[in-house]
Amino acid sequence: MHIERLTLKQFRNYDELDVSFEPNVNVIIGENAQGKTNVIEAIYFLALAKSHRTARDKELIQWEAPFARIEGAFQKQNGPLSLHVVLSGKGKKVKVNGLEQRRLSDYIGAVNVVMFGPEDLNLVKGSPQIRRRFLDMELGQMSPVYLHQLAMYQKILLQRNHLLKQLFGKANSDPMLDVLTDQLIEVAVEVTKKRFEFIQLLQRWAEEIHQAISRGKEKLVITYEPSVHVSEQLNLSKLREGFYQAYEQKKERERQRGTTLFGPHRDDLVFFVNDKDVQTYGSQGQQRTTALSLKLAEIELMKETVGDYPILLLDDVLSELDDYRQSHLLHAIQHRVQTFVTTTNVDGIDHQTLQEATIYEVEQGSLKKKG
């Protein structure tokens, strides 16, 4: 799949923009704060109905403007597709081929993207929250059912935490807590199951890619660490039983702290290279190779799952990779994946890639094709 045309109105620093893109590599050059990342962000938003930079949609609307609009014309294997998003003070409206989608889970997944920015290099050494977000973003694009289940889980979790805060310091419990606990565990079982299956699929690709980048010297293993024990066979009744055991063990502390202490919102991923925890013992090079392997594995897994390659968004990240890793990344996507690269200059980009790329220059909210 690839995006053929992007139209923006009152989005970030773009008053109006109407630009066409090529199906291979598109390089966007410009100084900082001129609008390079805003283009990437708009494409990302079209795919996921959210920004990778802020949780507040109204920050995307130009100052004092009543709304922002993002439109994209895409070409997929099964034909053309149009996506349309309008942001306003009342929220957001999304359309697929002109038809409004009432649930975001019905919208997300129409187009797939993989984002790789400097912050993604923290995937290995950063907080568990970064790794959970990685899980949710990538799995959510491939499984609308997972997105729906995750939204249900987050809604019940919010209600349960609210009730726990109300019960803080009180001697008596509330029957509603048992109801919400049962509901939370039922959805938690499904979310955990989907994550477990996703990691098993991702592992196969990531191990192969990491081995290639390390020239056969390293073996990468991804371990999913949910808040309760999961057997390799993923027995759902035992998983459910594990959640209830966790609840029994932690319910007094939950009452004392006013928050839920078990469930998918506390999951994590651990990466091992040659049996060593990369976060704790890995070199910076190993951590970056692991992050790169995961991103390339995402691309292959999406192709395998949905039948089409995603769009790759490289936001100011090539300069963070050494020549060897950059070369491996660009070679892996060559002629297969539509790619957007943002950079302040082209000096650090592979010469052959530049020869085949379409170059755009951005300056103060204006984007123009060079040459």
From Swiss-Prot:
A cellular component term (GO) from this record? cytoplasm
What functional role does this protein have? Answer: The RecF protein is involved in DNA metabolism; it is required for DNA replication and normal SOS inducibility. RecF binds preferentially to single-stranded, linear DNA. It also seems to bind ATP.
Name the UniProt record assigns to this protein: DNA replication and repair protein RecF
Q: Name one GO molecular function term.
A: single-stranded DNA binding
In terms of HAMAP family, this protein maps to:
RecF
Q: Is DNA-binding tagged as a keyword?
A: yes
* Gene3D superfamilies for this protein: P-loop containing nucleotide triphosphate hydrolases, RecF/RecN/SMC, N-terminal domain
Binding residues annotated for ATP, in chain numbering: 30-37
Species the sequence originates in: Halalkalibacterium halodurans (strain ATCC BAA-125 / DSM 18197 / FERM 7344 / JCM 9153 / C-125)
Subcellular location as annotated: Cytoplasm
Q: Which UniProt keywords apply?
A: ATP-binding, Cytoplasm, DNA damage, DNA repair, DNA replication, DNA-binding, Nucleotide-binding, SOS response
